[in-house]
Amino acid sequence: AMANILKGTVNPSGHTPDIYARTLRNDPSYVNFSDFKYDNSASLDSYAASTYFVEYEEGIYIGYRYHETAAKEAAKGNYAGYDYDKAVVYPFGYGLSYTTYSHEYAETPTYDSATQTYNFKVKVTNTGNKAGMGVAQIYVNVPWQQGQVEKAHVVLGGFAKTKELAPGASDTVNVEIKRDYFTSYDYT
């Protein structure tokens, strides 16, 4: 399969499932990974693996959620020194193809109160000169205020792939996002 992609007989349509950072040394979680060991674990000495730990401090800011939020905060002047273009090599949802696509809403997004689902009909057009399958991605941006439940700047809400499109052809796909996906919880 990989040979067919490299030869161009098959057009890839996958997208990155995570962000590819230039270096993990600039990621805030980097300092949390080491050979940390509990120093008061005499009762656990027979379970050597249990005496080691990794400090988890990132909360919701993992992978692309950290980088997208950091870029937004840097643009507002709240994160000095952060440069998205220098930190990220391939963003979340990035995909390579031997063709190009345009995306537009086929109609105004709707909400179905019976299923509590938002529906986004997206028209994807193959604007290149090779057949391929396009992907429509919808990202969610839920605003938050300081002191409220934290939210990442953007989160992938949903996606849908088209059928194979000849050059110039279009397909309309429906991306559904459940209302619960927008919900915030505070357990304090």
Predicted segments, located by residue:
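Short acidic, flexible loop segments centered on an aromatic residue
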Residues: 129-154
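Hydrophobic residues positioned within well-ordered beta-strands of beta-sheet architectures
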Residues: 118-120, 136, 173-175
